């Protein structure tokens, strides 16, 4: 199990930042094996599958981040606004990611990322590079609102 620390933004906002780390499986296959579940059980419990998918993607983003002198965080504030992953370089430049198992969640994830970006625009000195949604299926493309939709297969699978 690996900790994913909370991102420190130095935002001047009425919403307070949550500082606790999130925990993810470092090896999703071991988690599935220890649960003793197979393909059928995973297909019948999409909530569990979504949590496992998020851990898988975060593990891979962590590997890519380390290779590029960056770190992986999450964002969560007292208003309930949450971003699954913030990948930040030492220079302060960062990208924000939402991780969604299915393509049916893309619009809601994009709305969430755009809300996050609007808060940062007014209050944050760090430089946002891109807003991204990683999905388990579908095509990779850039939406009209400049949010990137990235299929898991584009990450090298």
Task: Pin down the residues of each PLM region.
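Accessory nucleic acid-recognition modules appended to NTPase machines
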Residues: 1-94
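Switch/connector loops and helix/strand junctions flanking conserved nucleotide-binding motifs
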Residues: 33, 106-107, 140-144
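Arginine/glycine-rich "motif VI" loop of SF2 helicases in the C-terminal RecA-like domain
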Residues: 64-67, 115-127
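Short beta-strand/turn micro-motifs composed of small residues
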Residues: 76, 134-135
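Active-site ExK catalytic segment of metal-dependent nucleases
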Residues: 88, 95-105
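Structural beta-sheet core signal
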Residues: 96, 132-133
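Mg2+/Mn2+-dependent nuclease catalytic core
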Residues: 102-119
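Domain-level recognition of nuclease-like catalytic cores that cleave nucleotide substrates
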Residues: 136-157
